[in-house]
C-alpha cells in the first residue's frame, strides 16, 4: 500500500454523517487530514441561523473527536453570484434548474478546491459524496463511477467535474452503503451517527420552497386549463410547478371529459399566456417525450462526443437508467433519442449519461422532443 502520510487531504465537513465518516476513513488510511466547513448562505431568520450553527458545532465536535483541525470559510458571495442568481433566472424563464449540480461545479469543486490548494496547500480534497473514482496508473484520465450504494449514488450531481478535478478528489464513502457509514460513525462515537440526511436546496436547507422563492421572484397567478382550453383552476405562479407534477394543483377530485377520474398532472407551461396546461392520467401523451435537446455540455474526459453513441441517461436524480442514443449536433449541443418514450422530461434539469458504472458527463435539457402521437 502506498504511503499516504506525506499527503494532505482537506475534507469538506458539513456537520453530517457522510463527511464525518469520510474524515475518519482518510485518517485510518494514513493521510494528513484537516477539515473545512463552508458557510455558503447568509441566514436571515433565527431558525436558519440555528441550523447552520448546529452544523458547524457538529463538524467541530467530530473534528475534535478525530483530532483534526477544522478551518472555516465563507463562500456566500460566490454562492450568490455563481449559483443563486442563475437559479432565480432559470425559474423566471419558466424552467426548473438543479442548484445542487451548480453548487458542486462552482463551490465544492471550484472555490473549495482553489482555497484548499492556494491557502491550505492540499494534495487532495475529499467530500462525503456517494461516488467512486478510478485510479489509473499509466497516465490515463481518471473516471468517475457510480457510488456502490445504488440508492444513494450521487454521480448525477457531479457530472460537470473534469477529469482534473476528479484526479484531485477522494470519495471515501463511495465504496460503502449508507447503513455501513452510520455503523462506522456509531462505533467511533461520532455525534453525527444518527443525524438525519439533509434535503432541500443545496445550502439553503429545508425551508418552505414556495415561500422562499416568493421572497426573490414576484409570483404571477394565472389559469390552469385543459389541453382543450377549459379553465379548471388557478395556479399561484408557473415557477412553482414542474412538468409531470401531480401534487399542489388543487384540482383533485375534478372529473375530466366523459367522467374521467384519473389524477391531473402538469402537462405544459405556456409562458406567453401564463397558463398551466393540466392533463389526466400519468400515461397521457402530452407527458411523454421521445428524446431531448441538451446544451451546456460537460464531459468528464473533456472530449466532445463527435459520433453517434449508444449509452444510458438519467433525466432526474434516482431515476432508472434510460437506454438512449446520443446524436451530436455540434460540440455544444446534442440530440438524445430514448429507446422508449419517457415522461416528465423537464427543461432546465440535467441529462446525465452513463456507460455501465462510468459517468460520462451530461448537459442541461433545453427542450424535450415531444411524443409524435401527442
UniProtKB/Swiss-Prot annotation:
Reactions accelerated catalytically: S-sulfanyl-L-cysteinyl-[protein] + uridine(34) in tRNA + AH2 + ATP = 2-thiouridine(34) in tRNA + L-cysteinyl-[protein] + A + AMP + diphosphate + H(+)
A single cellular component GO annotation: cytoplasm
Disulfide bonds: 103-202
Database matches in CDD domains: MnmA_TRMU-like
Active site residues of this protein: 103 (nucleophile), 202 (cysteine persulfide intermediate)
Signal peptide as annotated in the record: none
GO terms of biological process kind: tRNA wobble position uridine thiolation
Region ranges (Interaction with tRNA): 152-154, 316-317
Record GO terms (molecular function): ATP binding; tRNA binding; tRNA-uridine 2-sulfurtransferase activity
Positions bound to ATP: 12-19, 38, 128
Keyword match Ion transport: no
Record function comment: Catalyzes the 2-thiolation of uridine at the wobble position (U34) of tRNA, leading to the formation of s(2)U34.
NCBIfam families the UniProt entry points to: PRK00143.1, trmU
Protein name in UniProt: tRNA-specific 2-thiouridylase MnmA
Organism from which the protein derives: Vibrio parahaemolyticus serotype O3:K6 (strain RIMD 2210633)
Lineage, opening ranks: Bacteria, Pseudomonadati, Pseudomonadota, Gammaproteobacteria, Vibrionales
Name of the encoding gene: mnmA
Amino acid at each position: 500500500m502506498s504511503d499516504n502520510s506525506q499527503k494532505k487531504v482537506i475534507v469538506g465537513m458539513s456537520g453530517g454523517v457522510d463527511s464525518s465518516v469520510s474524515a475518519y476513513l482518510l485518517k485510518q488510511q494514513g493521510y494528513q487530514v484537516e477539515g473545512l466547513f463552508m458557510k455558503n448562505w447568509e441566514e436571515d431568520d433565527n431558525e436558519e441561523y440555528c441550523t447552520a450553527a448546529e452544523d458547524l458545532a457538529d463538524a467541530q465536535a467530530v473534528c475534535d473527536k478525530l483530532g483534526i483541525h477544522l478551518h472555516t470559510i465563507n463562500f456566500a458571495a460566490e454562492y450568490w453570484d455563481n449559483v443563486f442568481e442563475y437559479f432565480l433566472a432559470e425559474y423566471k424563464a419558466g424552467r426548473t434548474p438543479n442548484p445542487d449540480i451548480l453548487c458542486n461545479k462552482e463551490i465544492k469543486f471550484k472555490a473549495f478546491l482553489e482555497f484548499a490548494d492556494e491557502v491550505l496547500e492540499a494534495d487532495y480534497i475529499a467530500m462525503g459524496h456517494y461516488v467512486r473514482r478510478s485510479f489509473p496508473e499509466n497516465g490515463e484520465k481518471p473516471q468517475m463511477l457510480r457510488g456502490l450504494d445504488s440508492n444513494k449514488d450521487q454521480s448525477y450531481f457531479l457530472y460537470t467535474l473534469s477529469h482534473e478535478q476528479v484526479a484531485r478528489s477522494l470519495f471515501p464513502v463511495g465504496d460503502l452503503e449508507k447503513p455501513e457509514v452510520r455503523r462506522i460513525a456509531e462505533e467511533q462515537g461520532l455525534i453525527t451517527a444518527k443525524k438525519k440526511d439533509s434535503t432541500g436546496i443545496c445550502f439553503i436547507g429545508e425551508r418552505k420552497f414556495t415561500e422562499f422563492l416568493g421572497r426573490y421572484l414576484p409570483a404571477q397567478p394565472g389559469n390552469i386549463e385543459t389541453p382543450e382550453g377549459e379553465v379548471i383552476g388557478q395556479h399561484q405562479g408557473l415557477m412553482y410547478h414542474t412538468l409531470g407534477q401531480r401534487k399542489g394543483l388543487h384540482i383533485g377530485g375534478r372529473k375530466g371529459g366523459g367522467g374521467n377520474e384519473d389524477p391531473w398532472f402538469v402537462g405544459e407551461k405556456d409562458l406567453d399566456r401564463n397558463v398551466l396546461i393540466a392533463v389526466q392520467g400519468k400515461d397521457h401523451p402530452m407527458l411523454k417525450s421521445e428524446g431531448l435537446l441538451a446544451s451546456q455540455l460537460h464531459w468528464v474526459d473533456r472530449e466532445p462526443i463527435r459520433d453517434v453513441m449508444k449509452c444510458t441517461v438519467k433525466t432526474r436524480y434516482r431515476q432508472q437508467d434510460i437506454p438512449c442514443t446520443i446524436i451530436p449536433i455540434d460540440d455544444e449541443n446534442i440530440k438524445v433519442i430514448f429507446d422508449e418514450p419517457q415522461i416528465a422530461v423537464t427543461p432546465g434539469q440535467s441529462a446525465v449519461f452513463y456507460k455501465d458504472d462510468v459517468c460520462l458527463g451530461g448537459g442541461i435539457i433545453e427542450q424535450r422532443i415531444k411524443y409524435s402521437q401527442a
